[in-house]
Amino acid sequence: MLDVAVAYSRYQFLGEEFLTWLWFVIEKNQNFIKSFDPDFVALEVGNRVVLENRKKDAAERITIKGDGASLEEGILALKKGSLITELNIVYKSAELRWQFTLKGESLNISTLSIPSTGSAESEEDIEGVVLEKIFLYDKALQLIEKLYAHFTKLRVSDTWHSSESPLIRKWIQSS
């Protein structure tokens, strides 16, 4: 049986490849996301991207943050072999908007901001407000779970090497 720490470090590349693939999907192919959420409007790179290049003797870390920050430095880092370790995502569905950061090494979600809900005007309304908040949290989590499940199936298929990986490389080189 694998030690948890060994397994964690051995497979963290999957989460980082997932985030890199997700950025590619955000830039080039958002239409297929509608199959996971019929009300899907958009998925955008938010206000923070962290990339890391571990191919040299020392790890190089690049952080791009701020509203309206240019992502060209991130593309340049991808060209040099970096992988995304954190990605802030803006998810829009119907008239609703979520924003959160996804960490590659563990796929932890942090700073999840959900759409605002109605306030409870009486004690009877509290249960409805709580259930609405649970639904809104779950909707963002379900999207990430479905995207990751799709990614893992794609990653172990022949399509990854024959089609998807070359498309990602082409996107990185042409940006």
Residue ranges and their predicted role:
Residues 1-175:
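Intrinsically disordered, low-complexity, charge-rich terminal extensions
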